[in-house]
């Protein structure tokens, strides 16, 4: 019965369904939504706007669905990086090809384990496969990449909708599965699509218990030492070991890797996005060293590699071939420590795979709850006694490592770094990183670095040569006077698309400045990520384009061989005709053009305000 006392009874079904979806998202802990304009998703847009007006959501409008999905991915990454909360951001779009445009971000989120919700509007079931306009089969469009999918529209019952939304949020967050990633909610909406009545948004209670939260390492240890955990993993402090840390977004795993390296005197072979590359045990130029680079006290890099007896692997190490070769060796005892149900072990050589929580629970040491600080303090002093190893069930190796084991690695890495010739592009990339590490921001928000220090700016690197320039040229951590902020890259599938848009999401969600370092091809892929609707707030984003006229990553691979040169320029270098300065200016970004290190250093010392692009001409 319709009556003024029951406003909902006057409302159309599409609007009621959209409001139920939005209310359920808010109560499940969702905070940020990226909206791409469209007709079929209009009911969702109205409901989201009302919820934002009521203070429950933060919205950003991005016209391109491909870019919008990457912006949402960046926002999700920001929450995990800065807040330790696996809170999925949402990308909302209309039906048809708009949904397919989210696929690149979805597969990156799948491979990287980033929470993400794709909320697509759809036509009613009756219109599918009839030739109706802007209608395709959207259910299952992302295939095996999603952790959960639901088709909403058969009922407007708020309880049924809330049930599906909560499941989607929990699945995206990895709350129960330890497998965070993308989910797809497909909402079927029939006209009328505009609301008939204003929505008086009810009191909603956002709950974070649907979201996975990162637990501080000290609280996890709860009096147990990192050495005891290491021994429980089957690692032996008396044998020569190395810790490999690939792309990693979990600060607690980074803390553990750094603490064990300190306690046992093991070197860290850490990628720039590992969160431990600036640790005192991190080895400079480790990849070149493993490939047989310049020597050290007691042997060259290849000799050091042959002396490794055991490996602890953390994160997703895919950046360099020498690390891949190291992880493929059958003569090294390897342990993978992960925080997810999926782990990296490309060659299948891992003897043991576990989470930190599982390792701690299996110890079951009496009195382990005596206090987290005791465990942390013991390891700070290098507690790696044989008795602790024996007590954790690990034997002591016959060949105790020399106390110089770490020093040999650090010295060899430094010698390799000193001997490495630096290209102009690499010099520009390293200059950008150095300036970013010294950047002072007026922002009130800061990011907690894995070593417990704070920084106010994030560096986003494209997954091509730029991240490799950093990997090859960053100094050892012990040489740093100030701890830089985190380095982020889309290393899930290591693609170059979406880099700028992801950085927009990082800057939007964190409220902090973000600097992007990117090559010309990767920039051309995602230059429209700089587009901003006139109604949207600015983000503090600076994009440094290292323009060496094409993709130079292939020149260092087998495709760059002289006998294949007839193919190389057209099919691999693929230089583009793009005037980055004019294009960025057309999108409303401030533009600078430079061609030398001095000019770059001067520009990088300025405050990052609004959107800007620096075109660095290398050729």
Short names for language-model regions:
Residues 31-32, 77-93, 99-101, 108-115, ...:
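Structural signature of the thiamine diphosphate
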């Amino acid at each position: 019965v319709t009556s003024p006392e029951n406003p909902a009874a006057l409302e159309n079904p599409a609007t009621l369904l959209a409001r139920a979806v939005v209310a359920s998202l808010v109560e499940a802990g969702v905070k940020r939504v990226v909206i791409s304009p469209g007709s079929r998703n209009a009911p969702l847009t109205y409901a989201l706007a009302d919820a934002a007006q009521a203070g429950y959501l933060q919205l950003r409008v991005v016209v391109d669905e491909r870019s919008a999905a990457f912006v949402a991915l960046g926002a999700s990454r920001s929450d995990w990086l800065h807040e330790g909360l696996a809170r999925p951001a949402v990308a909302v779009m209309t039906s048809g090809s708009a949904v397919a445009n989210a696929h690149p971000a979805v597969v990156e989120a799948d491979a990287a384990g980033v929470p993400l919700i794709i909320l697509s509007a759809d036509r009613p079931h009756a219109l599918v496969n009839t030739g109706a306009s802007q209608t395709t089969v959207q259910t299952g469009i992302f295939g095996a990449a999603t952790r959960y999918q639901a088709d909403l529209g058969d009922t407007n019952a708020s309880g049924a909708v809330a049930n599906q939304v909560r499941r989607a949020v929990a699945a995206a967050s990895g709350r129960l599965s330890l497998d965070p990633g993308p989910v797809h909610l497909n909402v079927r909406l029939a006209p009328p699509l505009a609301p008939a009545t204003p929505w008086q948004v009810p009191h909603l209670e956002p709950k974070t218990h649907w979201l996975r939260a990162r637990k501080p390492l000290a609280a996890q240890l709860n009096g147990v030492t990192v050495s005891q955990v290491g021994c429980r993993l089957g690692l032996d402090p008396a044998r020569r070991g190395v810790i490999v840390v690939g792309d990693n977004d979990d600060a607690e795993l980074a803390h553990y890797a750094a603490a064990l390296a300190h306690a046992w005197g093991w070197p860290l072979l850490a990628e720039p996005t590992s969160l431990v590359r600036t640790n005192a045990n991190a080895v400079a130029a480790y990849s070149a060293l493993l490939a047989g680079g310049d020597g050290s006290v007691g042997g060259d890099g290849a000799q050091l590699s042959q002396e490794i007896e055991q490996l602890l692997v953390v994160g997703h190490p895919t950046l360099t071939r020498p690390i891949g070769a190291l992880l493929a060796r059958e003569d090294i005892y390897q342990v993978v420590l992960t925080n997810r149900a999926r782990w990296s072990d490309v060659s299948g050589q891992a003897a043991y795979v576990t989470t930190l929580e599982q390792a701690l629970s299996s110890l079951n040491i009496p009195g382990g709850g005596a206090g987290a600080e005791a465990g942390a303090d013991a390891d700070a002093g290098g507690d790696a006694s044989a008795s602790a190893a024996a007590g954790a069930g690990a034997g002591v190796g016959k060949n105790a490592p020399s106390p110089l084991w770490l020093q040999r690695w650090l010295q060899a890495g430094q010698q390799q770094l000193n001997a490495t010739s630096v290209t102009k592009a690499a010099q520009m990339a390293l200059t950008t990183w150095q300036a970013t590490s010294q950047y002072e921001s007026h922002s009130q928000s800061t990011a907690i670095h894995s070593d417990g220090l704070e920084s106010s700016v994030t560096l986003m690197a494209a997954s091509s040569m730029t991240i490799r320039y950093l990997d090859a040229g960053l100094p050892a951590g012990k040489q740093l006077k100030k701890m830089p902020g985190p380095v982020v890259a889309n290393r899930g599938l290591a693609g170059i698309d979406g880099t700028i848009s992801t950085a927009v999401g990082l800057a939007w969600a964190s409220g902090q400045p973000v600097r992007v370092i990117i090559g010309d091809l990767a920039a051309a892929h995602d230059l429209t990520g700089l587009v901003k609707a006139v109604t949207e707030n600015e983000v503090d984003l600076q994009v440094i384009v290292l323009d060496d006229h094409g993709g130079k990553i292939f020149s260092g691979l087998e495709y760059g061989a002289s006998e294949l040169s007839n193919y190389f320029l057209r099919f691999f270098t693929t230089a583009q005709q793009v005037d980055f300065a004019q294009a960025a200016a057309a999108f409303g970004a401030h533009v600078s053009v430079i061609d030398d290190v001095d000019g770059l250093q001067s520009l990088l010392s300025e405050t990052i305000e609004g959107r800007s692009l620096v075109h660095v001409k290398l050729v």
